[in-house]
Regions:
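Conserved Rossmann-fold dehydrogenase catalytic segment
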Residues: 128, 155-166, 186-202, 221-228, ...
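Mid-domain beta-loop-alpha active-site segment that forms a flexible
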Residues: 164-179, 198-206, 248, 252
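Aromatic-enriched alpha-helical interface/lid elements that frame and gate functional surfaces
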Residues: 232-308, 312
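Flexible, small-/acidic-enriched active-site or ligand-binding loops
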Residues: 341-388
Length: 395
């Protein structure tokens, strides 16, 4: 495949998003990633099924460029295979609770006994140390415990974001940490643990809100889509849809006032002197912007705001996002084949481009156990030994 991480072998014991997407990012830039699954397929393979075999949209998104083997690591024979595999690896990714890592012998001490310079990248729900360190959780626990859900929507009921931003943010942090650990190992020869946590990620994303609360005790309450620290910042109805407009900073506000044709009104009123004042008086500004948008189609509003260099975008359905001319022209999505799909899957490339050494989606996601025989043969197992492991239910 090539890439900046060519020669790095990663074992992906991850499940769902935080671990697997971390490994995906490493694979996209050249690492050899081997996904290790249960014999009958791990649960995350089948989330939101779209294929004849039950493979889901999430699996297709976060498992391109990977090999896949099946293995039962809870047996002695499975442990033997795993130790041989670990001995060839640079990184193990496993977003599993500490007690599960210990039971599977994927804890750092066990891995280090086999490969002294191994890097273990792991992510838990709550991190630690702390009274909740051994508890399990998904993306939503980070959202609800960071202040994000409290501040989303109108407050009753609170709303969790539909997109798993905590999981994906944790994957990004873990990939960054893994790269840093690989650089350090190149200098010192030492491996280490890279530890992410869903709650830590969520708190890092909401941190400015927490700082404001801690320092000045502002006690903000949710206000729907209406921004609270600048204006206009809201989602507005147009003649045929909805459009977002976000204005932060006085230069942008001056552009907006000029576009409204009311510079004297908006730029000389002390209620709108700076961002926080505009945020405090957001409903007044938003009402004016709402009237402006209501007179236009979404396309007219977006084009006019865009030409004025005011941040804006249309509210798109998933199908509209797929069809949007800029998204298509930019090549953010790559059509990928997979056995049993009625059509190609539009898989999002890594959202960062390197000018000289770009990442690539070089291979489709693997079928269950597609590379088991090949990987085991590389470890020294002959056909008879592989057949015996399969007969015994180890692979």
């Amino acid at each position: 495949m090539g890439g900046v991480l060519e020669g790095v072998r990663v074992l992906d014991f991850g499940r769902y998003i935080a671990g697997p997407y971390c490994a995906t990012l490493l694979a996209e830039f050249g690492a050899e990633v081997i996904r290790v699954e249960k014999r009958d397929g791990s649960e995350d393979r089948f989330v939101a099924p779209v294929g004849e075999g039950g493979e889901g949209a999430l699996f297709l998104q976060i498992n391109r460029n990977k090999k896949c083997i099946t293995l039962d690591p809870m047996t002695e024979q499975g442990q033997q295979v795993m130790r041989k595999l670990v001995a060839t690896a640079d990184v193990v990714v496993a977003n599993l609770p500490p007690q599960t890592l210990r039971a599977m012998k994927l804890d750092y001490d066990s891995l280090k006994a086999t490969k002294p310079d191994i890097i273990l990248t792991t992510a838990t729900a709550f991190g630690g140390p702390g009274p909740w360190s051994d508890r399990v959780g998904f993306d939503g626990v980070g959202q609800v415990m960071s202040g994000s859900v409290y501040m989303t929507g109108a407050g009753d009921p609170p709303y969790r974001a539909a997109v798993n931003w905590v999981d994906f943010g944790t994957a990004l942090h873990c990939a960054f940490g893994t790269l840093a650990a690989l650089i350090e190992r190149g200098k010192s020869g030492r491996g280490q643990i890279v530890e992410g946590a869903l709650l830590a990620t969520a708190l890092s994303f909401t941190n400015a809100t927490l700082i404001e609360q801690a320092v000045i005790n502002v006690n903000r309450v949710p206000t729907g889509n209406l921004g609270q620290t600048a204006a206009p910042a809201d989602i507005y109805r147009t003649r045929d849809g909805w459009v977002l407009c976000q204005v932060t900073g006085h230069p942008l506000f001056k552009r907006w006032a000029k576009l409204m044709g009311e510079e004297e009104l908006w730029l000389n009123d002390p209620r709108f002197a700076d961002d926080i004042s505009r945020g405090n008086n957001g409903p007044v500004i938003s009402e004016r912007m709402a009237r402006w948008c209501a007179e236009r189609t979404t396309q007219e509003a977006v084009d006019t705001l865009g030409k004025a260099m005011i941040p804006t975008g249309p509210v798109l359905s998933p199908q509209q996002a797929l069809d949007h001319p800029h998204i298509r022209a930019a090549g953010f999505l790559q059509d990928v084949d997979y056995p049993g799909l009625p059509k190609q899957a539009p898989v999002a490339r890594a959202a960062v481009r390197l000018s000289e050494t770009p990442g690539e989606i070089a291979t489709r996601p693997p079928t269950l156990g597609e590379h088991t025989d090949t990987v085991l043969a590389e470890l020294g197992y002959d056909k008879a030994a592989i057949a015996s492991l399969r007969q015994s239910g180890i692979i």
